[in-house]
């Protein structure tokens, strides 16, 4: 999808529902069910649902992705490491898209983008196996021309630009030099990837307050946002939280 007329076409929103499962797993119970949360997000207008199936199963479970595949009406994007176990699960579930991400034991959240200049064989094999089963593949990368070139060389046609540095620099409403520089890095990365005929997504740490500038960047067609939406949902409800984010993106 190419957005030549920004007044007509808005940036798409994929809602990451991991932290609905985080609440459930805090008590090792059945509620809240991320499957129900996904349905609410879709009914509120979300264009897709994202989940991260981690090796340690700290929140999303195999059961969740199997049921989500049967119930989601929009687009199911599963974030995962490029391991044999995870790729096997993806080939069983057949999501619309897999986003390959780095994964470190004990990390609170994903700490950076894939290093596409290393572990190339594992990433390439994962991409080939997924694409041969008609599963779209995106690589989560830092806003670096080197990483984008490397991802293209590995066979990727879609990237998700890591917005963590921008997000960390824009936690308040006060403009900062670091925030402006990080925003420009994302803009340049999106422009470069687009020039290579790649589809460009973005996400990580985005909030209602800082997402507007990212959504205005040409060629970024979709944003993956989770924690801030789920945090707001705890106060105003999930439907309202999704509607509020969609309003910002418009």
Describe the residue ranges of each PLM region:
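Conserved N-terminal beta1-alpha1 strand-loop-helix module at the mouth
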Residues: 5-85, 89-95, 153, 178-181, ...
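Hydrophobic faces of well-ordered beta-strands that scaffold small-molecule active sites
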Residues: 11-17, 49-51, 76-78, 98-100, ...
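Glycine-enriched alpha-helix->loop->beta-strand junction motifs that scaffold or abut catalytic
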Residues: 45-47, 71-73, 92-98, 132, ...
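Alpha-helix-loop-beta-strand connector modules within alpha/beta enzyme cores
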Residues: 58-84, 118-138, 178-202, 245-249
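C-terminal helical cap(s) of enzyme catalytic domains, especially alpha/beta-barrels
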Residues: 69, 172-179, 231-250
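Catalytic cores of alpha/beta
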Residues: 84-93, 144-154, 202, 206-220
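Glycine-rich phosphate-binding active-site loops on the catalytic face of alpha/beta enzymes
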Residues: 100-107, 158-171, 219-238
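Histidine/lysine/aspartate-rich catalytic loop segments that bind and position anionic ligands
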Residues: 136-192
């Amino acid at each position: 999808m190419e957005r030549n007329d920004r007044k007509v076409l808005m940036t798409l929103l994929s809602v990451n529902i991991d932290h609905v499962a985080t609440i459930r797993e805090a008590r090792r119970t059945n509620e809240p069910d991320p499957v129900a949360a996904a349905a609410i997000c879709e009914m509120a207008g979300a264009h897709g649902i994202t989940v991260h199936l981690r090796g340690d199963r700290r929140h999303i479970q195999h059961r969740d992705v199997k049921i989500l595949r049967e119930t989601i009406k929009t687009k199911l994007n599963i974030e995962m490491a490029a391991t044999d176990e995870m790729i096997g699960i993806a080939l069983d579930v057949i999501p619309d898209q897999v986003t390959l991400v780095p994964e470190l034991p004990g990390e609170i959240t994903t700490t950076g983008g894939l290093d596409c200049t290393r572990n190339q064989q594992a990433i390439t094999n994962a991409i080939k196996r997924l694409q041969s089963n008609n599963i779209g593949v995106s690589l989560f990368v830092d806003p670096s021309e080197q990483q984008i070139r490397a991802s293209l060389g590995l066979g990727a046609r879609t990237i998700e630009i890591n917005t963590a540095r921008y997000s960390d620099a824009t936690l308040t409403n006060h403009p900062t030099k670091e925030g402006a520089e990080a925003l420009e890095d994302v803009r340049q990365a999106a422009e470069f990837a687009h020039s290579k005929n790649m589809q460009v997504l973005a996400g990580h740490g985005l909030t209602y307050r800082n997402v507007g500038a990212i959504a205005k960047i040409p060629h970024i067609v979709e944003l993956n946002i989770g924690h801030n939406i789920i945090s707001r949902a705890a106060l105003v409800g999930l439907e309202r939280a999704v509607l509020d984010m969609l309003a910002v993106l418009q």
